[in-house]
């Protein structure tokens, strides 16, 4: 059986209720620029929701770049993550980061979140 690296609708948090549930007693992994909040879900796979506030990232093309990089990184690492719902909160300082830097930071946060969930 081959591993699929697609990013389908079922891998996303879609409704406000799904987002809200993650904010109640989450497992956290954070850096100065990004915070990951997670709770266990009843699915067989992880799901992700992204929030990039205009307050921190003013221009739409910058917000889109950040979301695209995080989504792509999640798509590549989804099979290493447990069945959890994750909300990614982006804060100040991400705009100045290069794409490669952002990729490394997000990978580090996935590992940190995985350790906190499993241990």
From Swiss-Prot:
UniProt KW keywords: Endonuclease, Hydrolase, Nuclease, RNA-binding, tRNA processing
EC number(s) given by UniProt: 3.1.26.5
Reactions accelerated catalytically: Endonucleolytic cleavage of RNA, removing 5'-extranucleotides from tRNA precursor
Protein's UniProt keywords contain Nuclease: yes
Function: RNaseP catalyzes the removal of the 5'-leader sequence from pre-tRNA to produce the mature 5'-terminus. It can also cleave other RNA substrates such as 4.5S RNA. The protein component plays an auxiliary but essential role in vivo by binding to the 5'-leader sequence and broadening the substrate specificity of the ribozyme.
Similarity comment: Belongs to the RnpA family.
PANTHER family tied to this protein: RIBONUCLEASE P PROTEIN COMPONENT
Subunit structure: Consists of a catalytic RNA component (M1 or rnpB) and a protein subunit.
Name of the protein: Ribonuclease P protein component
Species whose genome carries this gene: Shewanella woodyi (strain ATCC 51908 / MS32)
Gene name of the record: rnpA
């Amino acid at each position: 059986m081959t591993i699929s690296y697609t990013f389908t609708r079922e891998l996303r948090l879609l409704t406000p209720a799904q987002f809200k549930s993650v904010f109640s007693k989450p497992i956290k992994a954070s850096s100065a620029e990004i915070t990951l909040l997670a709770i266990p879900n009843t699915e067989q796979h992880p799901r992700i929701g992204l929030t990039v506030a205009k307050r921190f990232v003013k221009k739409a093309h910058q917000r889109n770049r950040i979301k695209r990089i995080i989504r792509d990184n999640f798509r590549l690492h989804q099979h290493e993550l447990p069945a959890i719902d994750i909300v990614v909160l982006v804060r100040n300082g991400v705009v100045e980061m290069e794409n490669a830097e952002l990729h490394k930071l997000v990978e580090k946060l996935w590992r940190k979140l995985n350790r906190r969930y499993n241990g």
